Amino acid sequence: STNLTNTASNKPHNYHEQSQIDQTLRLREVLKTLPPFAKDYFRAMEPKSSARTRINYAYDIRVFFHFLMENNPVYKNYTMDRFMPRDLENLEPVDIEEYLEYLKVYKRDEDGELITNGEKGLARKMSALRSFYGYYFKHQIIQKNPTLLVDMPKLHDKAIIRLDTDEVALLLDFVESAGDHLTGQALNYYKKTRDRDIAILTLLLGTGIRVSECVGLDLKDVDFKNNGITVTRKGGNQMVVYFGDEVAGALENYITGDREASTPLSGHEQALFLSTQRKRMGVQAVENMVKKYARQVTPNKKITPHKLRSTYGTSLYKETGDIYLVADVLGHKDVNTTKKHYAAIDDNRRRKAASAVKLREL
């Protein structure tokens, strides 16, 4: 039997390997709560999706079967293990439409909590169901696919929330001097985390990396000689992202100061960013830290680490006008994702286009 925290050579897993293992184990637990035939779909999905995507799809599909047991008289006395593929093709498009209606507000089975879904949530759950049905239809296990006869929920584009140039400076200045207004325990905590927080904020704003990529960084991933960090992207690919002098200064200040003075707990020795508990910082801790500071500087904007990524993408696009460069640096696999987010922002560019073409010399 294999020890899941160590490889055969007894070498500890890095953050990304460990997180894949944890998610795979979690997926197995979720699959136990789905109809047995669903395992085939998730096995087929494995080569082309991350464990996190499969977990999200498993939760979404579980909601669908709970809906059938709660709302469809045919399945009122069913338990999860009674469902068969033929039950999928016995449903009509109207059943799928009722499910979409149900998703807008429903009670979660485990704890009775009220769950609501907006456009994005509805689209994701419908996408999961279509993919699930599509697998059994493609393999001719079912002859009908009612999900294809139901329109996907319409997604409206939302304006990108980001920090303006002056707000970026205000945020960093605020973190640097926030201690001036603190005393006692709050001041001690601030002093302990100040350089780390400035390093994280400067890194997120200066490279546009994702928060999950940021917390996954190890000390060895930082290369000051070339001013680059090796990040593990969403799909597991590694890429070097380059940073400027401001980021280098903030990272160096943190690493040679607080980070070197820390004694990390066992298993966290390699982590670049440590919590006050001397463990690798988690995604939520970074999110809370960003919100804590941003709320003081831009109370009317809900700023998260992802908004810092949008801020970087916006600045880079405005400086270079090169959407392909922005897509590459942000690690977007499809340039259309980038276009959708950033091409709409540059109103000035479109205004210039209006006066660039002269019809008649005046």
Model-inferred region functions:
Residues 1-362:
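Conserved catalytic core of the tyrosine transesterase superfamily
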